Structure formats: C-alpha cells, structure tokens
Amino acid sequence: MLIIRKAKIQDARLLSQLLETSYRFYFSDLWNNKDELKTYISEESSIENIVASLETPDHHWFIAESHQDINVAATGHDIIPGNIIGFSKIVLNQLIPDKDFTGIYLHKLYLTPHLTGKKYGDQLFDHIVAFGQERGQKWLWLEVLEKNPKAIRFYARKGMEWQKDIIFSSETQQSTMHIMAKNLSLIKME
C-alpha cells in the first residue's frame, strides 16, 4: 500500500526532479527537436513554476511513497529518493473543453521510471477520484497523447472515456491529444 501525501512548498525541488526524470523517460522519443524538449522540460519543471502552482488554491500536488526503499538500481535514478513511487498534479474546477461544466483536471500522473505495472498508478488515480468527490467535483478529465497507448489503456480501464481530440503544437511539430473524462457523480464514495 502506498502513502499518498499532499505536496508542500518544501517538496518543490523533489517534484522538479521527478517531473524532469519521468518526462524524459516516458516522452523524449516523441519530440523531434531536442532543444524544444529541453525548453519544455525546463519550463514545466522549474522550481519557481512548481512553487507558484503549490501556492495556488485549486492546484494540488500529491507524492506517492512506499513504506520501504525501492531498489534504486532497478530504477536507475539515484537523484530520486528510493521510497518515491510517483506524483500527480490536479487542478479543481477546470472547464472541460467544449463543455459547459467543470471538474478536476488531471494535469500530471507520473510514476518513477521502471515502476509501472505494479498497481501504483491505480492507487494514485483512485486517491485523486476520492479527493475530487470529497470536494464536490462531478467530473475528472485529462489530456493524453495519442501516441501513448499504454496510458490510454490505463485511463480507459479506470473508466475514462474519449471526449474529443485537440492538437498540441510546438514550433516544429504537432501532436494529437485525446481528452478523456469520467463522471464522478456516478461513483459511490467508499
């Protein structure tokens, strides 16, 4: 069982390391231009941006930890403490594109590299659902890369349904993103 805790300002450096390491591991092959990748990661993982987000009332970051150290050699990432499994970022009350209702926007859900397939993602996702329901959120939605079939299958298995496609554009490429959503008001709270 994971320990899932709400991140604090003091966690900004850890979140920055987790974000940079995880994003590079999972998505660097999808970028045509490595300079654009570097710029994107630099902006997303900047400690200043993370602190600003942590200080924003509707933004919530969660860190998933194990009771014991995971073998660091297995992950290959010695800059991340051995008990860290992953993290997520959500934003409450976000308008779903082309809809007239709001919900939790699941902005990030990343596991430390090489720790997928162990049901950690399920626990973190379920925590987000419960957190949203406790705060009266009726919907959960996210954007997922079309070229990330593993994540799409995971979210579909968790009850997320395709809503529409949007385009993410950088200077040199475009990527299709699926918007997926789940009605939280149909789920009984435990």
Walk through the language-model features, giving the residues of each.
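Short coil/turn segments at alpha/beta junctions that flank glycine-rich nucleotide-binding fingerprints
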Residues: 118, 135-138
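C-terminal "cap" of GNAT-fold acetyltransferases
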Residues: 138, 142-152, 156-158, 163-190
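Acetyl-CoA-dependent GNAT
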Residues: 9, 17-32, 36-114, 125-127, ...
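Short alpha-helical segment within the catalytic ATP-binding CA
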Residues: 119, 123
